[in-house]
C-alpha cells in the first residue's frame, strides 16, 4: 500500500444533536471540538442532525402517506366530487 495517499482514520464521537445520543466510531472526518468519552480519552466530536436514534424509520415513528391516485388528489385539490360518491 502506498504511503501518504490515504486519509487518516481515527476514532471520533458522533453526537446526535436532536436526542443527545452519542456513539464512538472510526472515521476519516475530524473536528476541532473534542469531548471525553466513557473510557476517559478525548476524541473529536462530529455533530449530526439525525442518526439511527432519531430517524423515524428506525424509531418506528415513520408516517406513511395515503396512496391516493393522481385523479383523486386533483379532485380533492379543486373541489370536485369523486366518481365513487
UniProtKB/Swiss-Prot annotation:
One of its GO terms (biological process) is translation. GO terms for molecular function: structural constituent of ribosome. InterPro entries: Ribosomal_bL28/bL31-like_sf, Ribosomal_bL31, Ribosomal_bL31_B, Ribosomal_bL31_sf. Keywords: Ribonucleoprotein, Ribosomal protein. The keyword Ribonucleoprotein applies. One of its GO terms (cellular component) is ribosome. It comes from the Bacteria. NCBIfam families: L31 (TIGR00105), PRK01678.1 (NF002462). Belongs to the bacterial ribosomal protein bL31 family. Type B subfamily. This is Large ribosomal subunit protein bL31B. It comes from Staphylococcus saprophyticus subsp. saprophyticus (strain ATCC 15305 / DSM 20229 / NCIMB 8711 / NCTC 7292 / S-41). The lineage of its organism: Bacteria, Bacillati, Bacillota, Bacilli, Bacillales.
